């Protein structure tokens, strides 16, 4: 049955329509906001045997027809998803995943297909709401619904779902998702925004989210299918007690080993011994293979529960963390710059057993990344790429192209540094930072942010302020709340909230928060962000002990950038027909040249000499030719009425036969030949811009001198 519902959001109409399209999916909805239209489907298949995780897939599919264009690829089809699409898929996945039942092993796939784009209404936030509606309408077990909005900060005012013009001026790009009772996810990039403003923005977002959730609850009541009844295999109290008795003291001791690899090895040994013990017991009890494997899965699950309980108890009741630290204690920090001799800038940031090497490369304007997408074509001159090789955790695995995690962490690091990157007018280079994770025990994305700051300053990039990042955790048991600074893997896994905060001394530049429980109040969040600020400033102080400001000079191996400005109508003189002149300059000098439409010229040279040569040629090309100027020109062409002489690269004038010499000249070839260099004087520039020259007058001028 076809139905639709509409709600006012930030002055626009958000509409959800079902029962008309994609009806074979478990749940489907067409979501509209302004002229932006997204089809979102939710589908479930049979459970996968033998897996110990929930197989949720979220795909965000951009279609170029949504903006009335044909793809530019050879096949004229869309290719692999852009990073923006991958980030949108992660944005949808993160708040939804915790809301599926524990132990649910059915494949669930959510596909958001962008059908039409209105630049004032962003499709990713519409897709997030659409995904929740599709799940609410479906028979898939789901503890939702959720809503999501964006918040901007324009002229000091917080704005819900800012339009394109407002986004351009905004100091904040915040996305918040949550249920009626709690915020579940926060993702933000900001221009040094204070913690108080960030909290106000999150609170404002949650007020709007509540309205969206109420509408979705109404949608579920009116058109939702009966939910699939899922029952999880439950362990018997007797077996649960026996497992706990068998592993309790050993596991407690193992989890208190400070060193990660040693601790993991001991935990793995306990798991292996426990599984072997109970496998033998099940066989002695006469269980068949199917039942035995089923029971062993429950043993594994109970071991995991025991680990979680013990880690949480240790932290909440004793105030001690697995590596022996206090809740607010940050691991030992060690930094280094100038690590690699031939690169343009490098830095290593180490915090405990987490280590990142960041490397800066400076390039030309033409090295900017071109962003083809569902909107105006843009370029990006600051890029941060994050690599997470298997050796960083002491494992082996095939090396593949960057996955969602690498893309997400790279984008977070990029967002954190973007507000402090100098403007192109001040520093005209394209900047690429690559962060290689060398060791990992939690918080690698924040280590890459700190490493990026060190490397940028080592490269001599005049960043406005140094940036540091820290990963925080939170555990809540009844009314007791413990906030953890600089979390490691176990604390992230067993905690109730993890949040990553990056920024300068002046404010936040990036924030990522995932909350797994209800009941996190504004006061708790305020306290957590205050602790994060203290940790961030402590880390900044440690970093600045190694390098306290950008180096005054670039690396000798970095290219030299020379900028100059020419009149826009002179650009054609530099480029020449078919790029002939600019290519000749590049071949002769070995430089790279980029020209903007406003007449800005960027010359990237490996040394000062070649850069100056290119600049000199361009100056000659763009120099205004004036009557009375004298040039040393080369004869390019001879006709029966005169000779054409090149006075500047690509600029020619005519020396009429009567202007070649003081005496009568019968043949032009009697005076000049092709290739001769001769002095000429500009005697006229006609209304068409044609230049008339004189050899005889130039010679007279030279004699006077």
Swiss-Prot record:
Keywords attached to this entry: Cytoplasm, Magnesium, Metal-binding, Nucleotidyltransferase, RNA-binding, Transferase
Major localization class: cytoplasm
Matches recorded under InterPro entries: ExoRNase_PH_dom1, ExoRNase_PH_dom2, ExoRNase_PH_dom2_sf, KH_dom, KH_dom_type_1, KH_dom_type_1_sf, NA-bd_OB-fold, PNPase
Binding, Mg(2+): 492, 498
SMART domains the record matches: KH, S1
The S1 motif domain, residue ranges: 628-696
GO MF annotation terms: 3'-5'-RNA exonuclease activity; magnesium ion binding; polyribonucleotide nucleotidyltransferase activity; RNA binding
Reactions this protein catalyses: RNA(n+1) + phosphate = RNA(n) + a ribonucleoside 5'-diphosphate
GO biological process: mRNA catabolic process; RNA processing
Cofactor: Mg(2+)
Broadest EC class assigned to this enzyme: transferase
CC per GO annotation: cytosol
Residue stretches making up the KH domain: 559-618
Pfam families on file: KH_1, PNPase, RNase_PH, RNase_PH_C, S1
UniProt-listed Enzyme Commission number(s): 2.7.7.8
Residue stretches in coiled coil: none
Annotated CDD domains: KH-I_PNPase, RNase_PH_PNPase_1, RNase_PH_PNPase_2, S1_PNPase
Subcellular location as annotated: Cytoplasm
Assigned protein family: Belongs to the polyribonucleotide nucleotidyltransferase family.
Function: Involved in mRNA degradation. Catalyzes the phosphorolysis of single-stranded polyribonucleotides processively in the 3'- to 5'-direction.
Protein name (database record): Polyribonucleotide nucleotidyltransferase
Organism, scientific name: Halothermothrix orenii (strain H 168 / OCM 544 / DSM 9562)
């Amino acid at each position: 049955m076809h139905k639709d519902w509409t709600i006012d959001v930030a002055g626009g109409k958000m509409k959800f329509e079902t029962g008309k399209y994609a009806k074979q999916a478990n749940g489907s909805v067409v979501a509209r906001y302004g002229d932006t239209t997204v089809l979102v489907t939710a589908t479930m298949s049979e459970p996968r045997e033998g897996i110990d995780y929930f197989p949720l897939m979220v795909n965000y599919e951009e279609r170029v027809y949504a903006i009335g264009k044909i793809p530019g690829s050879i096949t004229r089809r869309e290719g692999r998803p852009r990073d923006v699409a991958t980030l949108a898929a992660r944005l949808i996945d993160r708040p939804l995943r915790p809301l599926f039942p524990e132990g649910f092993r059915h494949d669930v796939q959510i596909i958001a297909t962008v059908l039409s784009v209105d630049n004032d209404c962003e499709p990713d936030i519409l897709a997030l709401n659409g995904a929740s509606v599709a799940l609410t309408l479906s028979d898939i077990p789901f503890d939702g619904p959720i809503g999501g909005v964006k918040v901007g900060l324009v002229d000091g005012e917080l704005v819900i779902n800012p339009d394109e013009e407002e986004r351009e001026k905004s100091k904040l790009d915040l996305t918040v998702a949550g249920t009626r009772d709690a915020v579940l996810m926060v993702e933000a990039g900001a221009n040094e925004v204070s913690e108080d403003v960030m909290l106000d923005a999150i609170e404002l977002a949650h007020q709007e989210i509540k309205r969206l959730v109420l509408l979705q609850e109404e949608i579920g009541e009116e058109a939702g299918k009966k939910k699939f009844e899922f029952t999880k295999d439950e362990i018997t109290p007797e077996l649960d007690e026996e497992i706990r008795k068998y592993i309790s003291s050993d596991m407690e001791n193992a989890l208190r080993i400070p060193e990660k690899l040693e601790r993991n090895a001991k935990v793995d040994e306990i798991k292996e011994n426990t599984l072997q013990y109970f496998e033998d017991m099940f066989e002695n009890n006469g269980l068949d293979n199917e039942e035995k494997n089923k029971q062993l899965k429950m043993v594994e699950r109970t071991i995991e529960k025991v680990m979680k309980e013990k880690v949480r108890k240790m932290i909440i009741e004793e105030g001690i963390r697995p590596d022996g630290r206090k809740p607010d204690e940050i691991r030992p920090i060690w930094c280094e710059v100038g690590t690699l001799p031939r690169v343009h800038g490098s830095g290593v940031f180490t915090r405990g057993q987490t280590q990142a090497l960041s490397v800066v490369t400076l390039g030309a304007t033409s090295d900017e990344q071109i962003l083809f997408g569902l909107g105006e074509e843009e370029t990006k001159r600051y890029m941060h790429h994050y690599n997470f090789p298997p050796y960083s955790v002491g494992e082996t695995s095939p090396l593949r192209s960057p996955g969602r995690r690498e893309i997400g962490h790279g984008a977070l690091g990029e967002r954190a540094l973007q507000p402090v990157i100098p403007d192109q007018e001040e520093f005209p280079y394209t900047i690429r930072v690559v962060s290689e994770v060398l060791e990992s025990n939690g918080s690698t994305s924040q280590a890459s942010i700190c490493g990026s700051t060190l490397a940028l300053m080592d490269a001599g990039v005049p960043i406005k302020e140094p940036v540091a990042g820290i990963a925080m955790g939170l555990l809540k048991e009844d009314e007791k709340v413990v906030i953890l600074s600089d979390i490691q893997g176990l604390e992230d896994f067993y905690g109730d909230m993890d949040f990553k905060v990056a920024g300068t001394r002046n404010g936040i530049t990036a924030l990522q928060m995932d909350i797994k429980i209800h009941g996190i109040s504004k006061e708790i969040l305020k306290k957590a962000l205050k602790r994060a600020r203290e940790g961030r400033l402590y880390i900044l102080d440690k970093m600045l002990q190694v390098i306290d400001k950008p180096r005054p000079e670039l690396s000798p191996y970095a290219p030299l950038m020379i900028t100059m400005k020419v009149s826009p109508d002179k650009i054609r003189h530099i480029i020449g027909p078919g790029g002939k002149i600019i290519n000749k300059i590049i071949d002769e000098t070995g430089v790279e040249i980029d020209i903007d439409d406003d007449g800005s010229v960027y010359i990237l040279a490996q040394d000062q000499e070649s850069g100056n040569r290119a600049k000199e040629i361009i100056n000659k090309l763009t120099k205004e030719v004036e009557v009375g100027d004298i040039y040393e020109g080369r004869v390019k062409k001879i006709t029966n009425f005169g000779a054409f002489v090149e006075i500047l690269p690509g600029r020619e004038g005519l020396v009429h036969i009567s202007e070649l010499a003081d005496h009568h000249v019968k043949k032009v070839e009697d005076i000049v030949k092709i290739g001769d260099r001769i002095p000429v004087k500009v005697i006229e520039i006609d209304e068409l811009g044609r230049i008339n020259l004189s050899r005889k007058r130039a010679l007279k001028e030279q004699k006077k001198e």
